[in-house]
Curated annotation (Swiss-Prot):
Family indicated by similarity: Belongs to the asfivirus B175L family.
Key words of the record: Late protein
Domain of life: Viruses
Pfam families: zf-FCS
Organism classification: Viruses, Varidnaviria, Bamfordvirae, Nucleocytoviricota, Pokkesviricetes
Protein name per its UniProtKB record: Uncharacterized protein B175L
Species whose genome carries this gene: African swine fever virus (isolate Tick/South Africa/Pretoriuskop Pr4/1996) (ASFV)
GO molecular function, one term: zinc ion binding
Induction: Expressed in the late phase of the viral replicative cycle.
Length: 175
């Protein structure tokens, strides 16, 4: 026996008008084509110099999953000289620190691509700081934070990231 039962979901305390208004707002948001807002959110696909690089990002770090106020870092995908004679690097990701970028490389790349990406990241560090380095210690996993079942508060986790960033230049400089 077949019944003709409509698909109805009853939500206590929600009126049909509220549902229709919510649907209209969501549709209006999807149909909005605000190029200026879109440009602000995306990092450029190519890096040439620190002076031309963006100073902030409205997205979370790909590794630690936190919003940040520092200059966004990235994993370089290539390095070459462009037609204007400038060094150019391909951009992958949005990271709050070089340590978070290094951690991303360690997790998502296999050899020999991992080694190449790490070397390009060391070169990027030089562009940002004018220091040659041999190694960037990777960031701890975001799962070490309490909200993921770990032992570190968000503040302690951020403090650990800052300590890692400060230790890069003091311990791993080429001589």
């Amino acid at each position: 026996m077949e019944t003709n039962c409509p698909n109805i979901l009853y939500l206590s305390g929600i009126t049909i008008e509220e549902c229709l208004q919510s649907k209209k707002t969501a549709t209006d948001t999807l149909n909005t084509n605000d190029d200026e807002a879109e440009v602000e959110k995306k990092l450029p696909s190519v890096f040439t110099t620190v002076s031309k690089w963006v100073t902030h990002s409205s997205f979370k770090c790909w590794t630690c999953h936190l919003y940040f106020k520092t200059v966004p870092k990235f994993v370089p995908t290539y390095m070459r000289e462009n037609e204007r004679g400038e060094i150019e690097m391909g951009v992958l990701g949005n990271f709050c620190s070089f340590s978070c970028a290094a951690s991303y490389v360690d997790v998502h790349y296999t050899e020999p691509k991992r080694w190449e990406a790490r070397e390009l990241l060391n070169m990027l560090y030089r562009f940002f700081t004018s220091q040659w380095i041999s190694y960037i210690k990777p960031a701890p996993s975001y799962t070490m934070r309490k909200e993921y079942g770990g032992k570190l508060s968000e503040e302690a986790f951020i403090s650990e990231l800052h300590t890692l960033e400060e230790s890069i230049s003091s311990k791993h400089i080429f001589i």
